[in-house]
């Protein structure tokens, strides 16, 4: 087994060799518009997966992914020979070509973010003249908490009537009315 750093270096080199061969050496019209985006090599360096994208002939043309896949399959042997000559490893990895869907995912994510921004802008327009439904501060309670007359602590008012009782706060829930002996 090779270490991960060697596998990454080999994958990078394979991607560069395949991209160069597709662009300059292999004259298959089905490979026009094919771009190599990435390559991954297994830990034993015997298999390589090469990721590619396909562009249309113009900006408005749909890419011919099936034609590009067929052209890559036809050129697989030549590309593997070039990879073997260019890398100098004892065993030339077998090449597998996979259509890279990252660009489609990025495009879909951009669309979702644009929709979210539009929804945020609509919400901001609605908020401009909006007022709260109730009071400005619904949690404010005028005069319900007062200082405790009990020494050393705060109290909690248990009712707001004329017979309001201040209950001292105690720590640990000790109310003093249990039957345990005091130490």
From Swiss-Prot:
The keyword Phosphoprotein does not apply. Keywords: Cytoplasm, Ribosome biogenesis. One of its GO terms (biological process) is maturation of SSU-rRNA. It comes from the Bacteria. Its main location: cytoplasm. The keyword Cytoplasm applies. InterPro entries: KH_dom-like_a/b, RbfA, RbfA_dom_sf, Ribosome-bd_factorA_CS. One of its GO terms (cellular component) is cytosol. One of its GO terms (molecular function) is ribosomal small subunit binding. Residues 132-183 are annotated as: Disordered. It is found in: Cytoplasm. One of several proteins that assist in the late maturation steps of the functional core of the 30S ribosomal subunit. Associates with free 30S ribosomal subunits (but not with 30S subunits that are part of 70S ribosomes or polysomes). Required for efficient processing of 16S rRNA. May interact with the 5'-terminal helix region of 16S rRNA. HAMAP family: RbfA. Belongs to the RbfA family. Monomer. Binds 30S ribosomal subunits, but not 50S ribosomal subunits or 70S ribosomes. NCBIfam families: rbfA. This is Ribosome-binding factor A. The gene is rbfA.
